């Protein structure tokens, strides 16, 4: 049976995951510093051609790549959240279904879908649970533009 602390920790981590998705979809990347990641976080978005680096490198990448002009709409739906608590740290695996609307040169938009997993480490801080390591793991893609080639 889960203790009250374990139940609370799981809910807090789930809220953190949903908060991350909301900030990404609203393009509030700077807020990731304050309320999602630890200062020393390491993030690996290479499964879909993104950056591998620290928090500042990741925020710079997001600000440059997920612009309103290029991606007017995105949605990151998290589910099948698996969390293994280990005191003040935890590990997790989170499914993400990610529809993306992309602007194309003729003025239209193109919608494609990404299926992925986030493989995470979490740490309890004075401000609450934060992600200390995140790695995207590709599961599948659908209807991506021909020029997009993602790592296997």
Language model: regions and residue ranges:
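A solvent-exposed, acidic/Ser-Thr-rich amphipathic alpha-helical stretch
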Residues: 29-98
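A beta-strand edge to alpha-helix "cap/lid" segment located at domain peripheries
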Residues: 67-152
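Charge-dense, low-complexity intrinsically disordered segments
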Residues: 3, 7, 49-52, 109
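Short, well-structured alpha-helical interface segments that form or flank functional binding sites
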Residues: 15, 53, 117
């Amino acid at each position: 049976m889960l203790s009250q602390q374990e139940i609370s920790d799981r809910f807090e981590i789930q809220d953190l995951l949903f908060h991350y998705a909301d900030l990404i979809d609203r393009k509030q990347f700077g807020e990731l510093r304050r309320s999602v990641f630890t200062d020393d976080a390491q993030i690996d978005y290479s499964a879909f051609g993104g950056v591998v680096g620290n928090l500042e490198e990741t925020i710079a990448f997001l600000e440059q790549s997920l612009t309103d002009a290029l991606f007017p709409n995105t949605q990151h739906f998290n589910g099948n959240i698996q969390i293994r608590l280990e005191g003040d740290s935890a590990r997790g695996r989170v499914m993400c279904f990610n529809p993306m609307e992309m602007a194309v040169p003729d003025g239209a938009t193109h919608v494609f879908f990404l299926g992925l997993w986030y493989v995470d480490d979490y740490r309890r801080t004075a401000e609450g649970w934060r992600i200390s390591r995140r790695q995207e793991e590709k599961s599948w893609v659908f209807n991506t533009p021909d020029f997009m080639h993602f790592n296997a």
